[in-house]
Amino acid sequence: MNDTLIIRELGRQPYEPVWHAMQEFTDQRDEHTADELWVVEHDPVFTQGQAGKAEHILAPGDIPVIQVDRGGQVTYHGPGQLVIYFLLNIRRLNYGVRQLVNHIENTVIETLSDYEIDAKARRDAPGVYVDTDKICSLGLRIRKGCSFHGLALNVNMDMEPFSRINPCGLSGIKMIQTKDLNGPDSFSEAADAVIKHFTSSLSYSNILQQTGLAQDYVKAS
């Protein structure tokens, strides 16, 4: 049993190397591997999940589109958006997939509540919403009883690229961000708040901060 959690700050990164590192980490881990949260800000990219449909990518323009192995449909990542990847042994945590999704959604809801933002989850469409507007997207993959991929919380970003897609396959959905609701207006503030809430109800006895990707999981280009 490993009750250590590593919080890995990656800074700003292109999407594909981080995605491939997640896959490599998950493939190599065993029952003794510590869980990790990867905290990252991505260069502009559209990612199309396994349930995605081409018609939901309306006009990507100069932003690349990458087909990925997470659940869900198309979303946008870019500067000013908080992305956290959850590399967790959910069997060891005694979590089911739905429990993990609920925990992540509730983490964001509780974080926003600290700023008097009334957010909620929807059973029919994963993520976090304020009224009918979406502020946080969520997509996971489970392999060998372990999760990867994660959440994307809009903090202080250029929202225009969302108009080039039907976010999460939802036509007409409005995407919003925390800055415009008197919530966190910086990446670091949002990251600290979300991580605090996520870890508060889990039983990790040792939480370590690290920076950068471990080279064992970085594929040579």
Curated annotation (Swiss-Prot):
- Which superkingdom, per the lineage? Bacteria
Enumerate the residues binding substrate: R70, G71, G72, Q73, V74, T75, Y76, H77, S137, L138, G139, G150, L151, A152
Major localization class: cytoplasm
Could you state one GO cellular component term attached to this entry? cytoplasm
- Pfam families xrefs: LplA-B_cat (PF21948)
Q: Does the keyword Protein biosynthesis apply?
A: no
**Protein name (database record):** Octanoyltransferase
Q: Which organism is it from?
A: Idiomarina loihiensis (strain ATCC BAA-735 / DSM 15497 / L2-TR)
Query: Lineage of the native species?
Result: Bacteria, Pseudomonadati, Pseudomonadota, Gammaproteobacteria, Alteromonadales
Name of the gene encoding the protein in the UniProt record: lipB
